[in-house]
Amino acid sequence: SDRFIDLEKDEYIDLFEIEKNQRDLNLTAGRSVVCVDRKGDGNYGVYVANYGGPTRFYEYTDDIIVDKSVQLNLAKITGGRAVVAGHIISDKIDVFAANERGANFLYKNNNGKFLDVANEYRVQDILQNGRGTALADIYYRGRLDILNGNWGGFHRAYVLKDNIFEDIAKPPFDEPSRIRTVISADLDNDGYDEVFMNNIGEPNKLFKILDNGLIE
């Protein structure tokens, strides 16, 4: 199963090896994880994107690790690949999950539970196979947008316009590649974010997000 490592008395232990935490072990193929403060109170849970099995969402409850994915409306079965969390469409932490052989998920935080609104916001991208994803303020307007890399397909740069995400990606950024991971940050401290795209069997790519959403 997964491992949940904790430091106790200068010793690292796997909390899932403790019997009381073994009720909800994840016995499917995990692909990506993200920590989510779903209530905004400083307490984090762990969203686990699985391949061919239901999503998990682990939290500590009464000193026991419990999977709350069912009660939080997250227990979907898909080809999970990548996941990010942040203030995407609500004033709390939302979740975007990029999937393979199925639609992406965009979970809007609804008072600590989640509602998949990927179809309404046009980010399902059902014909593509998601691999790596990151959040970035593409227009430098103080809100998070979605960068999504698709395996052998067109990469996306989703920006929110009139309550719908529009893909503004253009060549060479959107050109298909055997992508594995996407990260975004101001790597050279010049005030503009970069996007690093990690590919397999071909060169990696590094882009810069300039003014007006230009990625080059």
Description of each model-found segment:
Residues 30-40, 80-93, 130-140, 144, ...:
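Beta-propeller blade termini
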Residues 29, 53, 79-81, 102, ...:
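Beta-rich catalytic cores
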Residues 34-36, 48-50, 57-60, 97-98, ...:
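Residue-level detection of beta-strand scaffold positions
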Residues 1, 40-49, 90-98, 140-149, ...:
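Acidic/hydrophobic-patterned starts of short beta strands in beta-sheet-rich repeat architectures
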Residues 1, 51-53, 61, 100-102, ...:
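Short loop/turn segments that connect beta-strands within the blades of beta-propeller domains
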Residues 18, 39-40, 52-54, 89-90, ...:
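Short acidic/polar capping segments at secondary-structure boundaries
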